[in-house]
Amino acid sequence: SAASDVYKRQVYPVITGSGGLTLAKHLEVPFTQEVVAVSTALQDYAPQCDVAIELGGEDAKIIYFTNGIDQRMNGICAGGTGSFIDQMATLLQTDAMGLNEYAKNYKSIYPIAARCGVFAKTDIQPLINEGATKEDLSASIFQAVVNQTISGLACGKPIRGNVAFLGGPLHFLSELRQAFIRTLSLGPDEIIAPDHSHLFAAVGSAMNYSEDVCVPVEDIIARLKAVSYTHLRAHET
């Protein structure tokens, strides 16, 4: 059967991303640092890239490529990330894509704190009570993410030249991407927005595969079944 053929197919597995190192150890497969994976993919797709901005569900990072690699990443707080956007969308009784649609027709931007969901809620609730439109609030939420990323991660280091936008939020939310472009005053030739930007770390990790580790898919599935979530968490702490 087709399933049997897939299970027996030989693959070169590689893991990257948050929490990936622990899983890679238990599965006995190679691990690639996310910054290495992203750098590899960008060198292949857009070697002219000077800076990459990547937003994930709970992390945000800026990677500078000029004069060596310099990665800036947020700490334990998920402010200004995908989960923050989801929290704010719930306040407006919509989802992330709903925010994106609203933001397309904004007229005003309000100051909102993005360093923490709690602070942001205290900024947004009075605006809702005062009758601010969902269009303006949505655009303001995206602008808050931009401000948090630039001020919290760049810390004064200029973001200039050719800039790549990576990760799920920047891939699916066109208005969030536009808020960055607008704030950074980027020209059309300076914008790097790959078609599969939300999968860039995975693409880059695959490009860093090891020829020494080749196993059938069914072996990986068996190893996954043998690893418990509780066991993984115990090894991360």
Where do the model's predicted regions map?
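Phosphate/pyrophosphate-binding loops at sites that engage ATP/ADP/AMP, CoA/4′-phosphopantetheine
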Residues: S4, K8-V11, T149-G161
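Glycine-rich phosphate-binding loops at beta-strand->alpha-helix junctions
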Residues: S18-G19, C155-T183, P194-H198
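Conserved phosphate-binding catalytic cores of ATP/NTP-utilizing and phosphoryl-transfer enzymes
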Residues: G19-T66, D70, I150, A154-C155, ...
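Conserved phosphate-binding/catalytic loops in two-lobed NTP-binding clefts
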Residues: F31-V35, I181-V203
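Glycine-rich phosphate-binding loop plus the immediately following alpha-helix
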Residues: N67-S108, C116, M207-E211
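Glycine-rich phosphate-binding/hydrolytic loop that grips phosphoryl groups
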Residues: I85-D86, A193-S228
